[in-house]
């Protein structure tokens, strides 16, 4: 039975990962060893079997005893510990939610419903580093994997509507505080049916712009507004989040020689934990819409084709409908006015499940089954 070290299991992604591992009985198949950065010797989580007290996540000697390390501790931890561990001669498998190693030549970005062949080839070749992808990229590929598999995508534009969870737990809390502050500023007016909506709107706008409005984490109002920039600014005018779309899509698909152009604008919106994306796909040939729907819907068990009608789209193609589920609905599928090779689509997915935790959990299972 493989000794598997879990690090960062208390954080947001780590907690979702733990919940999924319990649901799928993954702990039955491993000898779990839990690590901490702050509570060495403390009590580990309840996973249905005896576990040792918490070990020091910075102890190279402890980490070296493991067959697999599964970390959701973040990029700073990876940058500090990973090189020391490899230098110490550790030959185990490193599975990581953080982006630090994502684009390294000796790392594979894992999304097995899309790139299982790439993963298997890497395992056969002795690759030891398996990294979770960017959440929007993973969710887009889960939705449109069928089109990429069929070699139909010439280029793609992704305009995103990204949830607060992508920025972290404190940001989710801040979004709710912002919503609460906006509501509190006009609660009395809302209770009075005779109050004028333009007066209410003016008061809300004043609240959003006030110094007292809680923006410590986002740096700007998100509740009742949006933020048209995610991550660092790059010299070419892209945000780093936008750069990831093409870089990671092609790395996941192992398209190093002839990359598919992917670009767009990434926007933070007031959703809690589901990212949505409006996609424009340039096909390299004219394919009937019914064939496209078949390719998409048959690609993996989680993608869900939503018919392009108003009622079902409003009901099923939203963050509220999808949050907390592994379902990746894709809808609004239609040929665009630009021509028969231009396809429009809209997709939604849980940023913490297929966007983060689930590909890591499944990578562990792939290792255990070998």
From Swiss-Prot:
InterPro entries assigned: Asp-semialdehyde_DH_CS, Asp_ADH_gamma-type, Asp_semialdehyde_DH, NAD(P)-bd_dom_sf, Semialdehyde_DH_NAD-bd, Semialdhyde_DH_dimer_dom
Enzyme class: oxidoreductase
Keyword Transmembrane appears in the UniProt entry: no
PROSITE patterns: ASD (PS01103)
Binding site for phosphate: 102, 244
GO MF term set: aspartate-semialdehyde dehydrogenase activity; NAD binding; NADP binding; protein dimerization activity
Function recorded in the entry: Catalyzes the NADPH-dependent formation of L-aspartate-semialdehyde (L-ASA) by the reductive dephosphorylation of L-aspartyl-4-phosphate.
Similarity comment text for this entry: Belongs to the aspartate-semialdehyde dehydrogenase family.
Assembly, per entry: Homodimer.
PANTHER family in the cross-refs: ASPARTATE-SEMIALDEHYDE DEHYDROGENASE, DEHYDROGENASE, PUTATIVE-RELATED
Protein name per UniProt: Aspartate-semialdehyde dehydrogenase
